[in-house]
Amino acid sequence: MRSHYCGNLNKSLAGQTVELCGWVNRRRDLGGLIFIDMRDREGVVQVVVDPDMKDIFSTANQLRNEFCIKFTGEVRVRPDSQVNKDMSTGEVELYATGLEIINRSEALPLDFNQTNSEEQRLKYRYIDLRRPEMSDRIKLRARASSFVRRFLDENLFLDIETPVLTKATPEGARDYLVPSRVHKGSFYALPQSPQLFKQLLMMSGFDRYYQIVKCFRDEDLRADRQPEFTQIDIETSFLSSNQVRDITERLVHDMWKELLDVELGQFPIMKFSEAIRRFGSDKPDLRNPLELVDIADLLKDVEFQVFAGPANDEKGRVAVIRVPGGASLSRKQIDEYGKFVGIYGAKGLAWMKVNDRAAGLEGVQSPVAKFLNADVVNGILERTEAESGDIILFGADKANIVSEAMGALRIKLGDDLELTDKKAWAPLWVIDFPMFEEDGEGNLHAMHHPFTSPLGMTAEELKVNPAAANSDAYDMVINGYEVGGGSVRIHNAEMQTAVFGILGIEAKEQQEKFGFLLEALKYGTPPHAGLAFGLDRLAMLLCGTENIRDVIAFPKTTAAACLLTNAPSPANPDSLAELAIAVKFAEKKDA
């Protein structure tokens, strides 16, 4: 039906007869001529319908926006005075010699010229995706997927599929369960990742594996998360963590160069401890110049217990952010920032305006200045390199609360005060994560997953002091988003059993849940390491949007619902009976 795409017409085709299929983007009647802006996935071209072509002209009079049509015609070069520089096809137009209305359209539930609610856009997603902005995003995502496959194929990786119906394993989030009709009362789990299967592939001798794969997590959603998401899953044998990072960094570097013509340069490497200390986050946005500065040692002897308490607590932290020019912030603005850090558990936000740096204590304005002597104030000013006109914002509490609250405040200040360079790209690697983290009740949990290898420790050493262990893990971060994470894996049964034991998984449970893995580790398992990228997140960054739903053709809402199909929905009672499942809702308790 079609010989060319609308958006691909140019002067080199002048004089040729072409056939185009697409949609009416706009219709105009001017000076007896009808002009149709015709659109397909590649762009828009202007079609001219001459009244001398009576049958075509009569049909063109019936056209309305979003009619699906086919035009046949001659490509003509526009006069210089009529060139439209705002269109990629603006140097040419199509002189119509044939027109077919393939399908008419009713009035649209979306208005392409206005901002529509996200609910409407998701309900009528098939129409929303016709918008050039959305179409361009989906196409760029497709190009990214194609690039990944080409790059990994060229680097000797094998594309191998792993099961979707599998066994539930503890990987940090709830599983989506699928009941078995054959094995009544038993359930499959949809994979949160192909983690164990890709490790088994390494044990099978396939030393370079990849897969672009759907994964599923039943967790609370955010703007950059979905219940089903796509991973670029990678695993290797006989490569160190440095070598895995080198390959995957080249993949992203070359992707940005090919798709955006952006040179990312070499990615800096930062330890987890440094990232938390300087930025309050293990995924720092390095485009933002603000940093956290620790000052606990300066405050140990002050009488103000809000500062002295955390300063003398080994699990406490006192850190500040110096905001250049921030002395101009109003009290109302500062109070709003105080409410903001409260979201993260902070009890308040102390502040100090530096009106005259040279005057020391006498030159600052602060509700807490009366609790501090001149030496302490001068020490804070010196350490933060404060200047006249700056403001210093204080966080004092348990270390995790201060890091999270002040890290989030740093991002907000960078956005609000336009300190973050939104046009820049700032990738980095974060390495040497803690092996375990506490849950608040003294129990240890794997920070990544329980198959991650500790860094430079034997199984016996790990058992002696697990809380002090670091893992051979690494995350790739771009502009404050974790786009990929990986690690060296445990490749012997002794270490894997030790890690399970530290996590409170008893021997019987180990066999029930991971017996197949522990058995496989007995048979010459090679050292192996890997990484998984979030394709949705990579596409989000490539497209310059902050909402992951913008780069997924048919996404779910933050309530994990599909407004287009009304999924999830109640199951047919007969289907439930066949599965031996009864649905019972918890009874509401009286207030």
Curated annotation (Swiss-Prot):
- List the catalysed reactions: tRNA(Asp) + L-aspartate + ATP = L-aspartyl-tRNA(Asp) + AMP + diphosphate
Q: Which UniProt keywords apply?
A: Aminoacyl-tRNA synthetase, ATP-binding, Cytoplasm, Ligase, Nucleotide-binding, Protein biosynthesis
Q: Where does L-aspartate bind?
A: 171, 217, 448, 489
Q: What does this protein do?
A: Catalyzes the attachment of L-aspartate to tRNA(Asp) in a two-step reaction: L-aspartate is first activated by ATP to form Asp-AMP and then transferred to the acceptor end of tRNA(Asp).
Oligomer status and interactors: Homodimer.
* Family note: Belongs to the class-II aminoacyl-tRNA synthetase family. Type 1 subfamily.
In Swiss-Prot or TrEMBL terms, this protein is called Aspartate--tRNA ligase
- Organism of provenance: Aliivibrio salmonicida (strain LFI1238)
- Name the encoding gene, please: aspS
